[in-house]
Structure formats: C-alpha cells, structure tokens
C-alpha cells in the first residue's frame, strides 16, 4: 500500500500544479449564494432534483471555517473525495485479481483525464461521494461478516445523501444481496437509507424526467456505454461502439460459464445501465452522454467489469495486461486533463477579475446586476453582497491574482467596469471647435476622476479600455463627428487608468475640459 500512497501523492501534485489558483465555478455559485446560511433549506433543498445533503454540509463547513477567499481548501476537499473513490476501487479490484493487477486499474482511474470534470472540480464532491458510497456498499458485501450490514447502510446513506446516483446504487446493492441469497440479512441495511431518502423526497423531491425522452433512451444508453468505453483511452466513438459490444459478449460468456462466480458482473452492469436510463429520461434533451461528469461515474464500474474478465486468467498475466491498459489510458488522456484544467483556470480568471470590479462598486451596482451570466449565472449583486458580508470574505481576486490574470480576464473586468458606470460617454452640450493642427490621433490616457469633452473630425469609432489590452465590443462607441462627446471617469481602484482609443482609420479628435 506504500506504493499507492506514493501514487496518490504524485496525483495530488499534478492536480495542484495544473489547476493553479482560481475561484468558484458555475454551479458552485449556487451553493455560495444560497447555502451559506445555517438553515434547514441550505441542506435539504435539491440541486437539479438531487438530494445534496452531504456536499452542501461540506461546503457549509468550509464557508464557515475558511471563508470564500481560500478556494484551494475546496479543491483539496475535491481531491480527497476523488482519492477515496480510487482507493475503494483499488480495494475491490484487489479482492479479485491481487494488488499487482489492481494498482494499474486504480491508477488509470485516478489519472483519467477524460473524467477531469469531476476530479478537478470541487462541486462534483456530490457525484464522487455518491459513487464512493456505492463502492463502500460493495466492499461490505464482499466482506459479508457481522459488520457488513452496518457498513453497507453507511455506504448507501452517503450515496443517497450526495447525488441521484444513490438511487441506482440502492437498487444495485439490493440486487446483489438477492443474488447472493442474503436479502434477509441485508434488508434493514438497504431499507433504512432508502426510506430516509423517500421521506426527503416527499417533502422536497422534484423530478426532471420528461415523457418525450422515453423514445431516446435506447440510443442514449448505447452512446453512453460506447462513449464511456472510448473515454478510458480517449478513442474515437466509433471504436467505442465496437469495443463495447466485444466487452459485452465477453462478460455474457463469463457469466454463463460461471454464474455464481460472476454475480458482481450482473450487479455492475445493471447499476450503470439503470443510471444511464434515468439520466436519459431526465437529461436526454441536452444530449451530453459523453460529458466527463458521466464518464466519471461509469469508469470505475467499467474497470471493475474489466477486472472480472482479468480474473479468468492467472494473476501474473492479469497484472501484465492491466498494466499495459493503464499505461495506455493514462498517456492517452493526459492532455485531456491538462486541457480541462486550462479551461477551468481561464473561466476562474474571468470571474475572479469581474468580482474584483464588482466588490469595488457594490454600492452603485443594481441589486439584479449579473457580472457574468455565462460562467456564473447565479451571481446577482444583492445576493453576492449578502454572502460576502455574512461570511466576512470575498472570492474576488486580490492584487496578486489581478496581476497574473489572463488577457481575456482583464478584458472581462473592463466590461464590468463599463457596465457599472466606471466611465461614461455621452453627448455634451458644451461647444468645442477643432482648430486645424490641434487634433490628435491614437490613444489618450484618462486618469481616475477626470472629465473631458471631445469632438472627432468626422464619424468615428471610439474604444475604451482600462485593465484590458484591447477595447471590448461593449466598450466601443460611435462618435457622430458633428456633436461633442463628454467622457467622465470616476475614481475607484488605482489601476483604473482608462485609455481612449480612436479605432477608425485616419480618425482624429480634439479635446477640451
């Protein structure tokens, strides 16, 4: 197990190195803005129809202990949850093929780049914990001793309290208990968590299933299966369909030949198939079966099915074959993880810079103002103000983060500055005459708190920028040329040194105060 600890350490180093410093992402803002208060709704309110009690509790504790300005702690919580899933996978595989063959399998999952949407994003603690609970319940069934019912109940409680995957986890575990002829011994361990979830559903539950998705289920299930198989080595989807059918045939042969020995195959196949069916019924209209968050849930199950096939040969051969597979998987999906990390950093840079501006202008921002409806659609100025005041911390970038922010992020900050009135440009009543030889072209520096009147020598496009390198479309204005324009810059952040640029070819202007 020392080797596994070293592998986990290397994985942590890689995740931290490629993730860098960023802030909360997309759905996480729903938790930040709506679940920071200590009230029952913060924990029991569903998220996209999922019971999210456990992830909401984890985020709440972190909100209250480390605040909103230490996102690295949230990332660490996500890594630990992912490592728990990988370790449980290792333990289950060890019981079938031994440690030498199990290590490559667990490592392949640990570093699976095509599932980075979960492993690198703390919000997916819910999905990962739900899967971990299922694997813990399977571990309890494998032990099958006097402590197993309690361990199984804990696993199912964790799974149900974390995400919707817990529903199929309960069904899969119940199926295996029945196939093992141990249904009576495990009945309470299954029924108690299921009953608690049902009581929650009666009060808070919602369903996103749509009748029109019924006809889409077969195709969605087929593509989800093939896509998950292909994602293990980042192969084209067409090859995924071929290999998926070959794997299915091999598993059927194994079950037919040794039905009692391969009961786990039935459990795993039924569980993931049920998950894909339920996902199709509720999400097929969005058609994202190849998304990394779905691949993540399927990958350990597919790897355990592969382990079942490997158990048919001697352990030395199994270890060699699985080592080759793991090397293929890690190397082929390595860049996919790096690419997803870059995307997360880019989005985080933009939101962090936008919030830096919003923090400085909350006193003038309308309550319904949204700085970024794409990357952070849940952020409204009033709810954001309440959260940072209530938690006495802000997720906005500090000076160091602002300095290191990308070009695109700084441009997004300019947009928010402009939308919140940091600079205004309007028709002026004052008269100004451009005397020949007094016009200027190019770029003019406008310091904080300044005001000037300008007149272009003809119709021209004016661009404004402060933190960005180029003016955004939102900060471009058409000057008529026959009327003066007044430009006013208010005084807020010291780095807001606005620049006025004449963007039209051969455009010139003269200025007055």
Q: What is each stretch, according to the model?
A:
Residues 3-50, 59, 63-105, 175-177, ...:
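Intrinsically disordered, polar/acidic, low-complexity terminal segments
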Residues 13-15, 114-120, 160, 198-203, ...:
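Transmembrane-helix signature of polytopic, lipid-linked glycan biosynthesis machinery
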Residues 30, 34, 82, 127-137, ...:
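Hydrophobic core segments of transmembrane alpha-helices in multi-pass, intramembrane catalytic enzymes
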Residues 53, 71, 75, 103-131:
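Aromatic- and kink-enriched transmembrane "portal" helix at the membrane-lumen/periplasm boundary
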Residues 104-105, 195, 259-283, 325-326:
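Transmembrane alpha-helix segments characteristic
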Residues 119, 127, 287-311:
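Hydrophobic/aromatic-rich transmembrane helices and adjacent perimembrane loops
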Residues 134-150:
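Membrane-interface transmembrane helices that cradle and orient dolichyl/undecaprenyl
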Residues 148-164, 169-176:
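Membrane-interface alpha helices of multi-pass inner-membrane proteins
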């Amino acid at each position: 197990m020392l080797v596994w600890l070293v592998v986990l350490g290397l994985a942590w180093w890689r995740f931290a190195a490629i993730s860098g410093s960023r802030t909360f992402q997309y759905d996480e803002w729903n938790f930040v803005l709506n679940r920071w208060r200590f009230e029952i709704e913060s924990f029991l309110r569903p998220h996209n129809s999922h019971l999210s009690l456990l992830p909401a509790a984890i985020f709440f504790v972190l909100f209250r202990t480390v605040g909103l300005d230490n996102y690295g702690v949230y990332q660490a919580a996500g890594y630990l949850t992912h490592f728990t899933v990988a370790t449980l996978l290792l333990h289950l595989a060890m019981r079938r093929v031994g440690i030498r063959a199990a290590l490559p399998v667990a490592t392949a999952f640990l570093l699976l780049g095509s599932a980075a949407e979960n492993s690198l994003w703390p919000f997916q603690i819910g999905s990962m914990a739900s899967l971990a609970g299922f694997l813990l319940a399977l571990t309890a069934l494998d032990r099958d001793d006097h402590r197993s019912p309690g361990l199984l109940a804990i696993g199912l409680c964790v799974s149900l309290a974390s995400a919707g995957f817990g529903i199929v986890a309960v069904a899969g575990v119940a199926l295996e208990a029945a196939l093992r002829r141990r249904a009576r011994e495990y009945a309470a361990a299954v029924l108690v968590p299921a009953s608690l979830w049902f009581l929650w559903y009666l009060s808070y539950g919602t369903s996103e299933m749509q009748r029109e998705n019924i006809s889409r289920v077969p195709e969605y299930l087929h593509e989800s299966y093939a896509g998950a198989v292909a994602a293990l080595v980042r192969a084209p989807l067409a090859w995924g369909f071929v290999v998926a059918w070959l794997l299915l045939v091999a598993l059927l042969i194994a079950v037919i030949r040794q039905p009692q020995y391969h009961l786990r195959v039935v459990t795993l196949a039924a569980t993931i198939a049920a998950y894909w069916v339920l996902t199709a019924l509720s999400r097929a209209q969005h058609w994202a079966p190849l998304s990394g968050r779905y691949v993540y849930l399927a990958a350990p199950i597919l790897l355990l099915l592969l382990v079942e096939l490997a158990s048919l040969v001697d352990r030395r051969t199994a270890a060699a074959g699985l080592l080759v597979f793991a090397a293929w998987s890690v190397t082929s999906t390595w860049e996919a993880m790096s690419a997803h990390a870059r995307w997360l950093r880019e989005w985080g840079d933009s939101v962090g810079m936008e919030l830096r501006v919003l923090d400085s202008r909350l006193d003038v921002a309308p309550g319904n103002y949204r700085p970024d409806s794409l990357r952070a659609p849940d952020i409204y100025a009033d709810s954001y103000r309440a959260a940072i005041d209530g938690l006495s911390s802000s997720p906005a970038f500090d000076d160091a983060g602002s300095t290191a922010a990308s070009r695109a992020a700084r441009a997004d900050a300019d947009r928010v500055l402009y939308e919140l009135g940091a600079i205004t440009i309007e028709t002026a009543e004052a008269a100004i005459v451009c005397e020949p030889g007094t016009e200027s072209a190019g770029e003019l520096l406008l310091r904080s708190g300044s005001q000037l009147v300008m007149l272009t020598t003809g119709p021209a496009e004016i661009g404004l920028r402060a933190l960005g390198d180029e003016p955004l479309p939102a900060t471009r204005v058409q000057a008529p040329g026959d009327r003066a324009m007044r430009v006013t810059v208010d005084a807020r952040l010291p780095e807001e040194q606005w620049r006025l640029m004449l963007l039209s070819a051969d455009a010139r202007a003269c200025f007055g105060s």
